[in-house]
């Protein structure tokens, strides 16, 4: 009797595993995860949006499982027993059941969404590198990149300040000459009408003219310096927006390509008459190496720095 129960549990586990590897499950689940994972990050704070998306995911999982279990005649008790059996505790089975467990456990769900978001970003970056040969500066990792960005920004700032100083000096010289010319023009009527007061008039004219050479218009110098800096901030903000838009386009295109590939693979599988469970072999996801984790951390630090620059500006 015990052997029969074990055989029944084993059959239920294998049936569920076959369904979870098949297109009826994997296509809608993968589409949902890829479309919704963009807003997930590894911050400790759980946003309200996360909860709403998790509820949508839970409803999708329940609908798919309920339909399948009715088709093959497995009741809820059998399903629960199969999920808690030793056969479902292996690493292979846990990897297969992760999307199901994520519907009940928000922590598992969030980790799954963060992992998929990271995977999508890395795939988009690889596509950019393959097509362009090199990565944009904002997508290369490491502290050296941040340093390069800062150095480039300093070069731009110095150049802007240099040009600003030249323009300021030219403007000051032009105003000085204009004021000298106006001062001389005012002296002529005074010389014609009062010859006796010529020396005094000239003294007044010189007194008026000389300070003009060092005339400082309040706020002008400050405004001249702030203008280029403001332009620089606008330039950097616009550049960041363009980069973000560029990466989003690549991401959307990648999702479209992946969806088309899945549809074609599904059609090919149906034409050959093979069950999806036989076509797809379950593979365990390799854990990230320390180097990959370090690379990911550096990329996230850079992304946060760029995000702060955009928000602050």
From Swiss-Prot:
Compositionally biased spans, kind Polar residues? 192-203
Q: This protein's superkingdom?
A: Eukaryota
Show the GO cellular component annotation of the record: axoneme; ciliary base; motile cilium; nucleus
Q: Where in the cell is it found?
A: Nucleus; Cytoplasm; Cell projection, Cilium, Flagellum
- Coiled-coil residues are 147-187
List Phosphoserine occurrences by residue: 85, 147, 201
> What sections of the protein cross the membrane?
none
Keyword Zinc recorded: no
Similarity comment: family membership: Belongs to the CFAP36 family.
Q: Sum up the protein's function in the record's words.
A: May act as an effector for ARL3.
Name of this protein: Cilia- and flagella-associated protein 36
